[in-house]
A protein has these predicted regions:
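Compact, glycine-rich, soluble single-domain proteins
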Residues: 9-99, 104-106
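Acidic/glycine-rich phosphate/pyrophosphate-binding loops and surrounding catalytic core
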Residues: 87-151
Length: 151
């Protein structure tokens, strides 16, 4: 059990509301230039976030794995607030749906390679869709055993 003075409050908010809320002794978020590890008494911070995996280590030492979309993280007074366009815990991810989304995004990107069809494809959106789907698959695979992990 972690010392109460070394505890963070974490909240992950999407357009649908609060997706995750709890206590942690470590939060790792996907920053634009790499992962950011946040522990208690961290300096105040606001950082843009990339599509990636957010990991929350609970005071009991268990990890929650969450696929998060584009957004930002705010750290202030032992509180971490992640505001992003999407968030899914590993156990909530439908891998078949994520695989289908990945295939659709890959097909759109392949179509964009043809100059004649390029105007019909929004390359940026297809690329972001591929990143989201790949991230969801990766996070779900880390959690294939079910429940929070020890590492």
């Amino acid at each position: 059990m972690a010392d109460q003075a070394a505890i963070l409050h974490i909240e992950i908010v999407t357009p649908d509301g609060v997706d995750y809320e709890g206590e942690a002794d470590l939060v790792v978020v996907p920053g634009l230039d790499g992962e950011l590890g946040i522990m208690a008494h961290h300096e105040p911070l606001i950082s843009l976030l990339a599509i990636g995996e957010t990991r929350v280590r609970t005071p009991e030492g268990l990890y929650e794995h969450i696929a998060t979309g584009l957004g930002y993280a705010e750290v202030l007074f032992n509180r971490v607030r992640v505001v992003c366009d999407s968030a899914e815990r590993a156990l909530e991810i439908d891998t078949a749906r994520a695989e289908a989304a990945r295939r659709r995004a890959e097909e759109r990107l392949a179509t964009a390679a043809d100059p004649a069809a390029r105007a019909e494809v929004d390359f940026y959106r297809a690329e972001q869709a591929l990143r989201r789907a790949t991230n969801r698959i990766k996070v779900a695979q880390r959690r294939a055993g079910g429940g929070p992990t020890r590492g």
